């Protein structure tokens, strides 16, 4: 051990014993003991980045009065894609840390699907600069499947150089569960390389012996549970369940029956995909905690899931409790029930605007990633099918879709939209400059009566996805995305009525999160003016091309029957 470390430890010991003042002391409040469930009236002494004393009286070089307030451990978001916040990691840090999220475990597979290893390096470089502790899971499935065209390919050889990076935890969500079960050689190589480390799961609706086989590969965490029964089967088989509540995937209500003190050691919280507008209006993990307690979940259960249980699930042994020797990631709350952060400490540093200003900026990348071919109305024709036509059925608040079938109206020799049944056109256009693929189909559930909306955010390969009533408007929206280098676009009667540019890989803005938030307000209004009924139409649109989530999706290669893991002929 170095002399510097010995000296540092000696100072921690002296501060804990009370021989010398702590760096910071929080006085007059209490803390929530997540071991016993007690509210403990106590000073909290901080030395550098760790807690050095509790359950006593301390003097500090800086003393902060928190009378009447409660201190809890910093919250840990155990699975998210920062790209879905539509801002850079630096702006995500500034946006979310004040809500008490002191650790975020991200999978940068959105940017990796567009830019490959360069996208992962951008996140790792950013994570070294943020105030929040951003940890990175290495994207396991780039591309997610062979049923779509992505911008990059990340074989195991591309991941191994990052395996021991200080910000890397392990292998990110293994979405290709059929590949695991059927022992696909590419999947096997990645799983083998990360045995003994953390491997994150992604196995919606998988059960029985197939689930056993999937877990036998060493997968330990999973965030795709949408029912309590699904979660219980996985918990019984040793899986740590990450309860999800994002901007589209809202599973908290369905999973509340399992959020109990008994099961809380095997639970954690995550957002997966959450945009700045929802964060500004509702919050982040604090929103999940408030919602759960309002629905009579025991505070001890949900606060454990938000911190200590989450830390243990991912091997972060230094955080998750308000106790001596633990990392000083702390949130000062008005009450456990309201869960409003009055003050946040990240590694012993009080979170302020000045602290964010001290970060080194990281240069943006991928500013010319949208290489789609121009389209016109004729590109969106769908030939009349014999019998019924497959239609993607959108379920509000879910990324799972239904495989529906309808006899559609005919216009000329083409199938047409059916507004009476809320069925409109959907198309995916390859935008990485590889093959110019273009696939068309139908979707039900957006509520559009006119116009079109389009996006370069299209999980997971992030091709252009557009839905609409008018083929002319669909073409205008798709072409406009190329002009602004990616983003979201709303078109009505040939005119762009709303847009946001996302030029970093076609996924993230160069603007501050406040600007993105305000622009999203206007964008939603433009979508609602077309008749959109979904609470989050753009993120819901972004999941239509995701062929690893049941049941019917669309990629640039065509309609995908996810249950059969095959294109529909």
UniProtKB/Swiss-Prot annotation:
One of its GO terms (biological process) is adenine catabolic process. It holds the Pfam family Amidohydro_1. Keywords: Hydrolase, Manganese. It is an enzyme of class 3 (hydrolase). The keyword Transit peptide does not apply. Its EC number is 3.5.4.2. SUPFAM superfamilies: Composite domain of metallo-dependent hydrolases (SSF51338), Metallo-dependent hydrolases (SSF51556). It catalyses: adenine + H2O + H(+) = hypoxanthine + NH4(+). Gene3D superfamilies: Metal-dependent hydrolases, Urease, subunit C, domain 1. Its cofactor is Mn(2+). It comes from the Bacteria. GO terms for molecular function: adenine deaminase activity. Belongs to the metallo-dependent hydrolases superfamily. Adenine deaminase family. This is Adenine deaminase 1. The gene is ade1.
